[in-house]
Amino acid sequence: THAHIVALSQHPAALGTVAVTYQDIIRALPEATHEDIVGVGKQWSGARALEALLTEAGELRGPPLQLDTGQLLKIAKRGGVTAVKAVHAWRNALTGAPLNLTPAQVVAIASHDGGNQALETVQRLLPVLCQDHGLTPAQVVAIASHDGGKQALETVQRLLPVLCQDHGLTPDQVVAIA
């Protein structure tokens, strides 16, 4: 519609991508609305996020994640191109042992500014935080599922022992603060 064109006109790269690949986007994401596509395109590097969805959506819809259109759009809109590519690249590592994350957990982590960094940090720190510090995978995911998830996870790893032993906080309280 005219309103969608106006919204995308502030993002020339996305407008060009949508103009050239709109039918391909609809084929790759058949449940996506015009508003969904414009919502991704309006983001910083939205054109690249749409292009990443075009190339990665097919495999992300299949095992092990089996993401639906809404989940794919959420990652692209909130986490951007780097999150879409990270989820694609690490889908087997994230869902396999020892992490065993669910698709919903992967989407929750990836759907934020810095989602790709949070996913990378979860791969590195989830086993450590669970085995060495007694956190549950759900607690680690909760910490990672916000803007700045990487930094929050690294801070919890560094300060959890001090906060619990020296200051009497429980792990649940530290997770709530993080």
Label each PLM-derived region with a short phrase.
Residues 1-178:
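Non-catalytic all-alpha helical scaffold/repeat segments
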